[in-house]
């Protein structure tokens, strides 16, 4: 990528789109400091706390209870503006009813484990959330809850997804990866970009 500069603003919700192999995941890894750029740099502020939901997911101790998995991370999640939500309430918000919270992880379906993984990312109270293909394995109801959460999220968010409908609901502009190190900053959502 040549001559590309970008400064993320607080509360910004950005979508990243592009064909496979155009560098989206590499860009995310460089932003998070997992991969060094060949040239140039990423300056990340001292107060930035990344929350990263990846396609690879997270391995859980299958013998733990759902509530314990999340409670081992934090007793509450910081929602911004001085608002906090306890573990049980937060799990309930993400569709784990109180009785389900005391189930063992091994009893969860694949979709429920993905939802639990999402909760573990969010419980770390990130102020810069990166959702890399998060919509692939989440059901419609969970996506609706995530959509609401992102609308109220008091930090930056990057969403990498092929789900146009979800992107239209949660992002205010796009970075379009067009291949050959070409990135376009587009001020609008996915549908607006396609019509442009």
Predicted regions and their residues:
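ABC ATP-binding cassette signature C-motif
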Residues: 1-196
């Amino acid at each position: 990528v040549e001559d590309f500069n970008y400064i993320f603003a607080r509360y910004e919700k950005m979508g990243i789109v592009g064909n496979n192999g155009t560098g989206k995941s590499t860009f995310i890894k460089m932003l998070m400091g997992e991969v060094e750029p060949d040239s140039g740099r990423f300056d990340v502020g001292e107060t930035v706390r990344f929350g990263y939901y990846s396609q690879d997911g997270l391995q859980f101790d299958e013998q733990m209870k759902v509530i314990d998995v999340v409670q081992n991370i934090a007793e509450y999640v910081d929602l911004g503006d001085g608002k906090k939500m306890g573990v049980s309430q937060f799990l309930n918000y993400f569709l784990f009813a109180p009785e389900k919270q005391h189930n063992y992880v091994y009893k969860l379906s694949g979709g429920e484990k993905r939802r639990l993984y999402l909760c573990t990312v969010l419980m770390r109270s990130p102020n810069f959330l990166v959702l890399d293909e998060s919509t692939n394995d989440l059901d419609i109801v969970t996506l609706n809850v995530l959509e609401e959460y992102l609308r109220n999220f008091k930090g930056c968010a990057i969403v990498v997804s092929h789900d146009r409908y979800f992107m239209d609901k949660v992002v205010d502009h796009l970075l379009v990866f067009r291949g050959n190190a070409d990135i376009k900053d587009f001020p609008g959502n996915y549908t607006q970009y396609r019509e442009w």
